[in-house]
Amino acid sequence: MEDVAGRLPGHGLYVLPTMDRIGRLLKKNGDTANLDGVVQRCGIALSRRFLDGLGLAKRAGVVRRGLREAEALLQAGHKPLLILAANIATHSRQKFEGVVHRYAVDEWVELLDSVRLGAACGWSESVVLAVNDPGLERRLRVDAFRWQTFHRKVDA
């Protein structure tokens, strides 16, 4: 069973799922036939959890869309979570990096594509989003970290 929220009862240990760890576990148990299905289910569940959190933030009214609105939050002294679509254009990435450098933002998340990020908020494509609520920001950071960890290739 996939526990993407990290809430199942246990002994206080939560192992971050990665494709490699899941593969090793299934090979160890002799169940390699299910590998693709389990990996796909985990990837979908992690994406869905992040996008659900983003939709929740939108309904709470704490999501800003676009580089200008994100920069306005930074200029006002806020420290929002900046979310960048993985399919951002080179020119837009350069603008984003300029803003990040100007306001000394040391951390942002880059994942999924602009269509999925926008759809989670009920918009068309959205390349840059800013979430300005500490609680939702924390949840989205954790979910983004789990998503990125899952999709990272690990050699061991």
Residue spans for each PLM region:
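N-terminal cysteine/histidine-rich coordination modules
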Residues: M1-D31
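N-terminal targeting/trafficking signals and adjacent low-complexity tails
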Residues: R102, R152-A156
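Short, glycine/charged-enriched secondary-structure capping and boundary segments
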Residues: N29-G30, F96-V99, W123-S124
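Extended interfacial segments that mediate partner engagement and assembly in macromolecular machines
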Residues: D20-L84, T90
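Structural motif
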Residues: A85-N87, N132-D133
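Short basic, glycine-rich beta-strand/loop surfaces that mediate nucleic-acid
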Residues: E2, L8-P9, Y103-Q148
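Short glycine-/acidic-enriched loop or helix-start segments at secondary-structure transitions
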Residues: L25-L26, R93-Q94, L140
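Positively charged, polar, low-complexity stretches
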Residues: G6, G23, Q40, L67-E71, ...
